[in-house]
Amino acid sequence: MTWRRVSAAALSLSLVLMAACAGNDEEGGGGGAETGGGGEPVTLDFWVFEEGLFGYLDALEQGFEETYPGVDLVVTTYPEDNYGVKLDTAIAAGKEPDLVLVFGPDQMRAGLLLPLDDMIAEKGIDLSTYVPSIVNPGDEFSCAYEDHLYCLGSYAGSVQMLYNKDLFDAAGIPYPATYPPLTPEQFVDIACQLTDEANGVWGAAVSDPLAYLPWEMFFSADGKTAEGYVNGPDVVHQFEVLASGYDRGCIPSSNVLDPWQQGRDFFAKGQLGMVITDFQGLPKIEEAGINYGSTSSPTPSGMEPYFFVWTDSVGVMATSDHPDQALDFVAYLTTEGQLLRHDINDDIPLDLAVAEEVDWAGGIPGREEGLEVLSHARSAIFIPNRWDVIGPYYDAWGFVVGGEKTAQEALDEAAPAIQENLDKAWEVWDSQG
């Protein structure tokens, strides 16, 4: 899921630079916006990822400026890989924007973002029907930290399991429950039943076990111990379960079929029985006439399912010269912006009540099931800088899939390196507290 990450180095540098800027009141801040005093026009700078959302962003800008005629919203897009570098450079020059994308709790914890609580109360925004893991603390993509909310968004992206109902029917396999989901063992077994090599049909596609396994399997409850967990019997078993699907020719390796980049394309062609991937881009599948369903990701028996959920988390820099107007924008983004994004991009509103009001599902069972799954979104165990910490896991998975090592051997080798990364991550986290 590299498309969700910002590099640890870039984020750490951002935190240092932003803290320095925030501590220098004489320098001011806020992206070079005009003062806005005495009724003068106000300029808000908003930096986002370049995601091909220009229709939505244009409509968002136009709608906000019509609602707040004294404010000029300047939207600047950057490629996701360069966003952190661009932000670092701007901060070093004292020209950081007013509105930024938020990359987890680090910025919140450092006091670099304005809390949204008062604005939410004043605007009457009801968070009770928002996707839970975004507005509750603890998750990687959560907007909450220590009883305060620091960002909000306009849509809900998630990882779910899509399945082709017609292929299930042809194989005489009952549809899986929407929630709770299949176990990984059932997932692999069904994948092999659905595989039809003669007709070019793979039973399933999934990148690796971490695409669906809860993080609690890899770390202790306090998030500070990896050894004995990441290489413990439960994770070893799950490596073996998924690897068996590869070995039996039921699941392609990611270098053959990348489920994140190609999964929906193959699924829309009827060449996949199941795929664990982003629950987005559904019109392509629907226009192809695929009779599909959706469930939460496979989860070992006895464990609470966990799946990734994200949004376009937008926060207000504490150095903004125009905090009131910037807060107004976040409010607009997460209210009217949800409607605009639904109308233009067909994305799921972050507020599930809004999704129901606009009839996002439109009577399509797969969409209705996807909304049910989202209502169960929960926070994961907190691991600072988790993607860099877990890095050696991917090497271990590669060794197992390649047949070079057993699951136990590969994970035993990876565990000390993951623990070392984890210790360093917590050391950095604690030093910034």
Model-derived regions: residue spans:
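Short, solvent-exposed loop/beta-turn-alpha elements that line the ligand-binding surface or hinge
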Residues: 117-134, 177-180, 198, 217-240, ...
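Hinge/lid segment of periplasmic solute-binding proteins
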Residues: 104-158, 293-295
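C-terminal lobe and pocket-closing loops
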Residues: 121, 281-291, 300-395, 425-433
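Conserved N-terminal structural module of periplasmic/extracytoplasmic solute-binding proteins
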Residues: 2-9, 13, 21-110, 123-128, ...
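Paired acidic/hydrophobic, glycine-rich loop segments that form the ligand-binding mouth/hinge
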Residues: 98-101, 273-277
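Glycine-centered hinge/linker elements that transmit conformational signals in sensory
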Residues: 188-193, 227-259
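Short helix-initiation/N-cap motifs at beta->coil->alpha
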Residues: 77-86, 180-186, 254-268
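A local structural motif
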Residues: 68-77, 172-178, 226-227, 244-257, ...
